């Protein structure tokens, strides 16, 4: 559990050998070009970086010096932008990144908070949701998340980037997720906007929207891999809170061999608008 202010710098490689949690009222600053590696593990032993409600992350890479989250199996070294030994089918080698906030979500039974998917129920830092649409969890820009998605239970893996109840004062842009065994990025409610996303070769869905997420996702690309499911999976509200998302300028690319690869799965009264969606090379539309 990180408390106070912590600074991770690009002259080190940081290793997550368990769930590292940025506690409420704590701040983690990550310098451009920093590499963070997660160890293998399943269930309660899965490694992940979790920003708890009330915590802050300022992870701001640059175009030439992105912040990289990857596996300890990746041979990438300080100063490099990629390793040479892992490919798009090397998935589930560590956990992922979870950012949790106090923004509204539509939960079954109209409860005010819920335990986030990907964190075991007995870990109290996994709660998300609230009543502040303008909540601020920091900024997460020019970040690459690779080879994650550790299994924590039956049909329960960690997404590359999980955003649970994140508010619209949080900045999310220029984020890529590569070779995650579950979804690339999943939005559980909240109001945060995101742009310039790239999801490649996820084992499940590219972008997943749930629980009346009401932000805007724009200028983004999903590229399906050999094991991918839907490019988009969008579910509606679970409680009485009804709100709607916006998707603007999204490109969806199939690989023409993924039998289950589909453009989108809209379910459970999904509510939102999609504008300028370009889809190609998908077996099922």
Which residues does each PLM region occupy?
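Beta-strand/loop edge motif enriched in small/polar residues
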Residues: 1-282
